[in-house]
Swiss-Prot record:
Organism: Methanococcoides burtonii (strain DSM 6242 / NBRC 107633 / OCM 468 / ACE-M)
Keyword terms, alphabetized: Ribonucleoprotein, Ribosomal protein, RNA-binding, rRNA-binding
Keyword Metal-binding: no
Protein name: Small ribosomal subunit protein uS13
Region named Disordered: 128-148
Assembly mode: Part of the 30S ribosomal subunit. Forms a loose heterodimer with protein S19. Forms two bridges to the 50S subunit in the 70S ribosome.
């Protein structure tokens, strides 16, 4: 292991991961994979979770990549990040750029349907019922005028 060169950037799922981190922590650099999900992926591949990802062989990295592609079948329903998709009704686990695109799509659907949440997003106001009288103000402060 000492005579091998470390790869400082490892590319998995179109994401550059830091090569100096252990596998279980490096996988969390992919959007949609947290510690718990990365643990499930690493356990299913049989790779040591504490091994530094930069020292892994090409076969191990391909094994990780292919496992990430199909790991949502191994996860229980409650662990997926997109349960009962409004369009298809499926349970999915979104990764990478798909999360951002799906969120934008959902917000656009809310805006098109003129739902209350969509209108709040459109106007740049708070969405989840927070008070807005004194907090969440944007822009420069004008100040108070003194009486003459």
């Amino acid at each position: 292991m000492a005579d091998e060169e470390i790869r400082h950037l490892v590319r998995i799922m179109n994401t550059d991961l830091q090569g100096k981190k252990p596998v279980k922590y490096a996988l969390t650099g992919i959007r949609g994979i947290g510690l718990r999900t990365s643990r499930v992926i690493v356990d299913s591949t049989g790779i040591d979770p504490n091994a530094v990802i930069g020292y892994l062989s090409d076969e191990d990295i391909k094994k990780l990549d292919s496992t990430i592609d199909k790991f949502e079948e191994q996860l229980p329903k409650w662990m997926l990040n997109r349960q009962f998709d409004p369009l298809t009704g499926e349970n999915k686990h979104l990764l990478g750029q798909d999360i951002i695109l799906t969120l934008k799509e959902d917000l656009n659907d809310l805006k098109k349907s003129r739902a209350y949440r969509g209108l709040r997003h459109e106007r740049g106001l708070k969405v989840r019922g927070q008070r807005t009288k004194s907090t969440g103000r944007r822009g420069s402060t004008i100040g108070v005028r003194k009486k003459k």
